[in-house]
């Protein structure tokens, strides 16, 4: 089986996932930032009526009405006013934000599954923890078949899926820069949230994205529930990469150098007895056969599908990138500091985009989305939020490291 990579935000959209799943492979939606994406689709008049069609199948019509009343704008005149941005999600987020996140993920998975009987997955980031309980529940209400997670160690997610499958209350330890070893948790009670007849749910298959035998072993043996398999990502994979093991060394271009310690011994992955897929420059028929010969179930493909007609990239981005590839001028840089997650990140050089330092420096510094804010415990015991996108003076005044905003 080929897994379509989960590329956020909005690149791996429902159209791409549906198209892939209709071929018999695993289409995957990205659950990252779906509350914002969903609300903007509604404010653009919901072209094609797809969001409202999906919402018509949600089990709580009152909840749907509340979201539509707040965000939907008729198509005529849409786009003339600034977008109404949803509230930033927080540790004790309000009911509206929960409803929006659940509905957004429900709609994306519902549409990806529409018109066929094949499985569909959702991809979430461990580094973007705060929305994940609500995102998972929304996806499960729509019948999601696979949950794929990386960008961290999602050790608690298998147990969360077990509980959500029976609408039981769940909690998730949240990474907070805490004083005196204090711990902080996000909680979610589906029964209190929905307060309707609860539909039967299935527990989706959980695949952990790993970059080492050590991490795969930890997930297989120490997760709080069943891990069903792995996506084994090599450093060549697109998007976020695991940092090299040991002291960070950069090459002449400023990219992280991966060494022998970063080589993944596939025989040891295989010995764990769980199915696995290979990712990171495996996207050819020949590499697929090689992966299978090494014991893999198949491969995960991202980049090639990112430039398909169904992906969420704009046509202009697709056209310019493909032209650059044909001219031999396309380049990808593994940037050790581009992502607020702290993980290396693949950056495609594209004229007029934030890949150019001049364009990046001209962008006003503001924190308007907040998905990658750093949580920390304040002296009064409450949780504060540092945002690498906010003005540098504000970030540093909250105790942030100036290097984290470059």
Regions flagged by a language model, labelled:
Residues 3, 227, 235-275, 283-286, ...:
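Conserved active-site-proximal phosphate/metal-binding subdomains
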Residues 20, 291-292:
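Hydrophobic residues within well-ordered alpha-helices
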